[in-house]
């Protein structure tokens, strides 16, 4: 990608903020989206606000967008309903809403945010992710948005990974490369409070990380910047795990998988 205009959501903190800094350091113009302190302020959990956010981004980029990184997301202690609405349906509304602008961009690319929780969460099923993909938002909220189940977060992130794989050919026919990163445990303002919750702190400590430490937001941003760049021009439909080796350690023979 040449110096272009890239929309990044969740730029007020964490991976989104680090991605904005990284892309701007490379000379790109970044249109930031977040609840506050952004070029476009809005709440993607609210259906009524999503189209306005899309319209404002399109206005700021002049109708042509070269890249999109929907980083906005929530984890614990956010409610399960919020996880469903923000992490999947709000994200997908913006991605689909900005497709027409991406089609007018130069060598456009989208990098979605999945998670390595997709491959290490007990009880998570493929059917959970397919439910996000196939059901409408309110149906999914009714199913997963109540109670204390931990499934909504990894299910939504698995649905994003599936969507990238399923739609990469279709979007490539419009000239848009789709890929995703799957971060592991990253030291951000969203993750640190989990250490104050005994159950979550114990779970985090149990995660094996061959690299020997948590990841940094700038390390995820670097992977995102690479996937957006022309250096990744032949990479399409991939989910890149950036997790310090956790996925490879736990599932060494899963990828690549031969055809049946």
Name each model-derived stretch.
Residues 12, 16-21:
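N-terminal Rossmann NAD(P)H-binding glycine-rich loop of SDR-like oxidoreductase domains
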Residues 75-77, 81, 103-174, 185-186:
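Catalytic loop of short-chain dehydrogenase/reductase
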Residues 172, 177, 235-237:
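Short, small/polar-rich loop/turn modules that mediate ligand/substrate recognition or access, typified
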